[in-house]
Swiss-Prot record:
Entries under SUPFAM superfamilies matching the protein: Ribosomal protein L30p/L7e
The encoding gene: RPL7
Protein name: Large ribosomal subunit protein uL30
One BP annotation, GO: maturation of LSU-rRNA from tricistronic rRNA transcript (SSU-rRNA, 5.8S rRNA, LSU-rRNA)
GO molecular function terms attached to this record: RNA binding; structural constituent of ribosome
GO terms for cellular component: cytosolic large ribosomal subunit
Alphabetical UniProt keywords: Ribonucleoprotein, Ribosomal protein
InterPro entries noted in UniProt: Ribo_uL30_ferredoxin-like_sf (IPR036919), Ribosomal_uL30 (IPR039699), Ribosomal_uL30_euk (IPR005998), Ribosomal_uL30_euk_arc (IPR035808), Ribosomal_uL30_ferredoxin-like (IPR016082), Ribosomal_uL30_N_euk (IPR012988)
Stretch list, region Disordered: 1-25
Native source organism of the sequence: Debaryomyces hansenii (strain ATCC 36239 / CBS 767 / BCRC 21394 / JCM 1990 / NBRC 0083 / IGC 2968)
Family of the protein in this entry: Belongs to the universal ribosomal protein uL30 family.
Gene3D superfamilies: Ribosomal protein L30, ferredoxin-like fold domain
Pfam families xrefs: Ribosomal_L30, Ribosomal_L30_N
């Protein structure tokens, strides 16, 4: 019995499908290798960051001991970063502080943002002081905020940072591939801090456990909650996170 000949179009279609399947298989192998390499990079960076944080902490402890042994005082480095929380609503806000709150992206009560501390931003914070609480966040505070409340601004949408791929797609061109890269850039106020910080949507916090103080709108040093509370911002954020 004579074999059935396939029409030329079917032969071409079969070859094209086979070629497409081979290309997809090859692309999958490349993608898997790339993802494996990327995971290794992310893992190695996270380990390097942890060593960097630990070494810096030990260096400060040693410097304090050396200063004490020499009969002098250790002076902390000037803070480069603050975390700012809006604690007062929209009623009776003068135009200038209202504008500052808009510049800081603090458009809602209990919203929080990171701010690079400079002479200019220090002046802005003073103008908005009756409406905000701020201070110097530690690594633990930054990490808990980003992991628990972190959202990115993607096409004007608020998107949860549920996957490193989201971060890489938006910040990869700055070398920020993972959530630990993002935390490191914020904590160290790195060269791409502006891009990393602008990517972060303002944090939406809750009212603190037990509420604010009864003299909430007095300055912190007067028994209230507004203004610069330095390292004590970490306790407030923990209550609100």
């Amino acid at each position: 019995m004579a074999s059935t000949l396939k029409p030329e179009t079917l032969v071409k279609k079969s070859k094209a499908q086979q070629k497409t399947a081979e290309e997809r298989a090859a692309a999958k192998v490349v993608r898997q290798a790339s993802n494996q390499e990327k995971r290794k990079i992310i893992f190695d960076r996270a380990a390097a960051y942890q060593k960097e944080y630990t070494d810096a902490e030990r260096a400060v402890i040693k410097a304090k001991r050396d200063a004490k042994a020499a009969g002098s005082y250790y002076v902390d480095a000037q803070p480069k970063l603050v975390f700012v929380v809006r604690i007062k609503g929209i009623n009776k806000i003068a135009p200038k502080p209202r504008k500052v709150l808009q510049l800081l992206r603090l458009t809602q009560i209990n919203a929080g943002v990171f701010v690079r501390l400079t002479k200019a931003t220090s002046e802005l914070l003073k103008l908005a002081e009756p409406y905000i609480a701020y201070g110097y966040p530690n690594l633990s505070t930054i990490r808990h905020l980003v992991y628990k409340r972190g959202h990115g601004k993607i096409n004007k949408q608020r998107i949860a940072l549920s996957d490193n791929a989201i971060i890489e797609a938006n910040l990869g061109k700055y070398g920020i591939l993972s959530i630990e890269d993002l935390i490191h850039e914020i904590y160290t106020v790195g060269p791409n801090f502006k891009q990393a910080n602008n990517f972060l949507w303002p944090f939406k916090l809750s009212n603190p456990n037990g509420g604010f103080r009864t003299r909430k709108f007095f300055h912190f040093i007067q028994g209230g909650d507004t203004g610069n509370r330095e390292e004590f911002i970490n306790a407030l954020v923990k209550q609100m996170n």
